[in-house]
């Protein structure tokens, strides 16, 4: 996902270099990251981009810090101002944990999704999100790893059936935690990135969030919460290949607007 340029700085992730969507038009970005040769336990990453359609600058900056310990313990501080799909939440990242291109939006998803679906609906579900975040990721043993995070920000509404420019803005603050439980699974760690070598045993994911939100037409904040569960399993069928499946379930507590609903992957 990165292009080496010199010993201490590399370009990437490469999906940030160029994008196209109906809100921004053609967007060109300059993403950079420090390398392990500069700091083994610290990574600085940032991107500045300009959209020719909305004529606006956007981007993000993040700091990753790894504690010098035998097991993985990392801290991430991040601020982003980017367009994202309103249907993708934090727990959804587990479903795509092994993908090289793991963003919510990139050039390929923009082009193919825009060609396949009604352009009006495609346009409406991408929203500009401005968010600050602090996240802790920890390994406790070879079976259990956890994440805990605090995020505060604002986002567009993103409901597909409503006119984009008439939709309200949502302000939110959220405390979340999740756990990943695996059994005898091999993990490959590189510079602030992990890949999983799945075996024939299931992987279990659980998550919970508690937060508050307010739309710009509401006088005060409301509380909400959610619980999520996912099971991933790869079954070796020998000469018949393999079967990969996911099971997902969850609960949302409180009266919530569209951006706080959970959207399951696949055709609906």
Feature locations, PLM:
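Outer-membrane beta-barrel initiation region
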Residues: 1-51, 57-59, 89-96, 119-126, ...
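Residue-identity detector for glutamine
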Residues: 22-23, 62, 76, 104, ...
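Outer-membrane beta-barrel strand-turn architecture
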Residues: 36-38, 67-71, 140-142, 183-185, ...
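Membrane-spanning beta-strand positions in outer-membrane beta-barrel proteins
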Residues: 41-43, 72-74, 145, 242-244
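Short secondary-structure subsegments characteristic of cysteine-rich extracellular domains
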Residues: 42-67, 223-235
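Outer-membrane beta-barrel pore domains and translocons
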Residues: 47-51, 66, 78-82, 139, ...
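Helix-rich alpha-solenoid scaffolding regions
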Residues: 58-84
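C-terminal outer-membrane beta-barrel translocator/porin domains of Gram-negative envelope proteins
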Residues: 74-122, 192-197, 203-268
């Amino acid at each position: 996902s990165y292009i080496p340029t010199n010993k201490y700085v590399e370009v990437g992730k490469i999906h940030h270099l160029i994008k196209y969507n109906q809100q921004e038009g053609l967007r060109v970005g300059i993403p950079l990251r420090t390398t392990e040769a500069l700091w083994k336990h610290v990574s600085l990453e940032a991107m500045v981009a300009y959209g020719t359609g909305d004529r606006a600058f956007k981007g993000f900056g993040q700091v990753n810090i790894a504690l010098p310990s035998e097991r993985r313990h990392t801290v991430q501080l991040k601020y982003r101002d980017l367009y994202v799909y309103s249907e993708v939440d934090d727990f959804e990242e587990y479903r795509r944990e092994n993908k090289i291109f793991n963003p919510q939006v990139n050039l390929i998803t923009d082009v193919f999704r825009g060609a396949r679906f009604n352009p009006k609906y495609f346009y409406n579900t991408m929203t500009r999100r401005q968010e600050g975040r602090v996240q802790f990721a920890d390994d406790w043993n070879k079976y259990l790893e956890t994440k805990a995070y605090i995020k505060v920000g604002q986002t567009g509404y993103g409901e597909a059936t409503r006119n984009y420019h008439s939709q309200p803005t949502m302000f939110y603050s959220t405390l979340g935690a999740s756990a990943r439980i695996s059994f005898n699974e091999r993990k490959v760690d590189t510079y602030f990135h992990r890949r999983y070598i799945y075996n024939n045993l299931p992987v279990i994911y659980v998550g919970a969030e508690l937060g508050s939100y307010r739309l710009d037409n509401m006088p005060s904040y409301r509380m909400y919460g959610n619980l999520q569960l996912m099971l991933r399993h790869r079954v070796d069928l020998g000469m018949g290949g393999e079967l990969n499946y996911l099971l997902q379930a969850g609960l949302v507590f409180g009266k919530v607007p569209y951006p706080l609903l959970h959207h399951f992957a696949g055709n609906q």
